Amino acid sequence: MPADKICVARIGAPHGVRGAVKLWPFTADPLAVLDYGPLSTKDGKRSFEVETAREAKGHLVATLQGVVSREDAERLNGVELYIDRAQLPPPEEGEYYHADLIGLAAVDAAGAPIGKVLAIHNFGAGDIIEIAPPSGPTLLLPFTNAVVPTVDIASGRVVIELPAEIEGDDPAQADI
């Protein structure tokens, strides 16, 4: 079931001495965070209006209404900013909101369980799907059509085609 709030950005470290912050957007268009109006914490207790934003290397430099000093900005480092899901357009064909994928069952092509989707990461070279198997370490796999050929949100599952180097791994048989 889709989350009713979607995280669209995270406040980072201060930028300068006048209250500006580094803002790490999670939207396809980084400046889209300006279009959603006030952004709130997940619990809705605090709200932030982005007054200005400009693109920097991998993030935005933003000013938030009421944040006027470096000390104010430092206190916000790490705060995640959310909007109501209803504010987002529906995803296009073949695109998904990360929040909709978290918690889905991961199965192989035969339907055998592999685990659950724990997270979607992007370390700069494309999306990575993290799967938590019933036991053992989590799997980090490329989120590509070859590895994840089927995403069925309505059925609550993703089909995973494990790459041969993972599928065939057997630590007990490893050469020493």
Curated annotation (Swiss-Prot):
Keyword Chaperone (UniProt): yes
GO aspect biological process, one term: rRNA processing
SUPFAM superfamilies: PRC-barrel domain, Translation proteins
Disulphide-bridged cysteine pairs: none
GO CC terms of this entry: cytoplasm; ribosome
Matches recorded under InterPro entries: PRC_barrel-like_sf, PRC_RimM, RimM, RimM_N, RimM_N_sf, Transl_B-barrel_sf
Keywords: Chaperone, Cytoplasm, Ribosome biogenesis, rRNA processing
Domain of life: Bacteria
Protein location: Cytoplasm
Molecular function GO labels: ribosome binding
Entry keyword rRNA processing: yes
The PRC barrel domain, residue ranges: 93-166
Main location: cytoplasm
Free-text note on domains in this protein's UniProt record: The PRC barrel domain binds ribosomal protein uS19.
Matching NCBIfam families: 16S_RimM
Function, in words: An accessory protein needed during the final step in the assembly of 30S ribosomal subunit, possibly for assembly of the head region. Essential for efficient processing of 16S rRNA. May be needed both before and after RbfA during the maturation of 16S rRNA. It has affinity for free ribosomal 30S subunits but not for 70S ribosomes.
Oligomeric and partner information: Binds ribosomal protein uS19.
Protein family according to the UniProt entry: Belongs to the RimM family.
Protein name: Ribosome maturation factor RimM
Gene name per UniProt: rimM
